[in-house]
Amino acid sequence: MDRYAVFGNPINHSKSPFIHTLFARQTQQLLTYEKIEAPVDDFVGSIRRFFAEGGKGANVTVPFKEQAFQLVDQLSPRAKLAGAVNTLKLTDDGLLLGDNTDGAGLVQDLKYHLEELAGKKILLLGAGGACRGVIGPLLEQRPSEIVIANRTVAKAEQLAQEFAAMGKVRVSQFAELNESFDLIINGTSASLAGAMPDIPDAVIGSATVTYDMMYGSKETVFNLWAKEHGAIKTIDGLGMLVCQAAESFAVWRGIRPGTRQVIRELRRNITGA
């Protein structure tokens, strides 16, 4: 039976085995999928052992996505753009292919909820790896502009320069934001700590939708704040998690599983409802 895994540290919380088991059942694919906690100082060794022992493919999560980018023999165009790899595949000729499905997963989930991203004015909060991985796929949807806001502007400016050729991208400090947006995406990890990015209320207009890349058993702090300030819709990152997993599954197996039923089952699993 073909063997797959997700590598991270910590990894105990990962829902990837749950998701991929449902995908395999749905598509009638025979495979196993496990979680492996790689030592922080030996990610490369863990990956090499896994593939030497017959592994076919893997997902990579925090904090190893940049290391995976350096490790592979080949990079997909979207992995090159993202500067990080979250999906590894052993090709038929024994090469390790690196891909990045995060941005595609976000866009798929956004389009399910919003249908259209073209012409939208988007605010992206944060300039770390999570944000970098989604800017290219977002710009491919032709929004009117993306504003990258970060506590330190230098990191945001570097990102904006890298993606400037793909569309209109500008930067702002959190405190300087004084306009409203159609869509606000929280790519900071503040929600994990139950905290809020330090942004003014003015970013929420009469038709603002917010999307937090984080998720949990309850609504995230960021989405609760957005709702209190008049956001017309709030979405968490559970759909992105499942959609990027479906994209990885398609890279490995050549078949794309449906996501909506899996999202519902995962939501039940997380909330206990």
From Swiss-Prot:
Q: Name one GO molecular function term.
A: shikimate 3-dehydrogenase (NADP+) activity
Q: Give the pathway.
A: Metabolic intermediate biosynthesis; chorismate biosynthesis; chorismate from D-erythrose 4-phosphate and phosphoenolpyruvate: step 4/7
Q: Which Gene3D superfamilies match?
A: Leucine Dehydrogenase, chain A, domain 1, NAD(P)-binding Rossmann-like Domain
- Presence of keyword Transit peptide: no
One cellular component term (GO) for this entry is:
cytosol
Alphabetically list the UniProt keywords: Amino-acid biosynthesis, Aromatic amino acid biosynthesis, NADP, Oxidoreductase
Which amino acids does the record list as binding shikimate?
14-16, 61, 86, 102, 215
**Which of this chain's residues are annotated to bind NADP(+)?**
126-130, 150-155, 213, 237
The GO biological-process annotations, alphabetized, read as: amino acid biosynthetic process; aromatic amino acid family biosynthetic process; chorismate biosynthetic process; shikimate metabolic process
Instruction: Look up the EC number in the record and give it.
Output: 1.1.1.25
The reactions it catalyses are:
shikimate + NADP(+) = 3-dehydroshikimate + NADPH + H(+)
The record's family statement is: Belongs to the shikimate dehydrogenase family.
Q: Under which name does UniProt file this protein?
A: Shikimate dehydrogenase (NADP(+))
**UniProt organism field:** Tolumonas auensis (strain DSM 9187 / NBRC 110442 / TA 4)
This protein's encoding gene: aroE
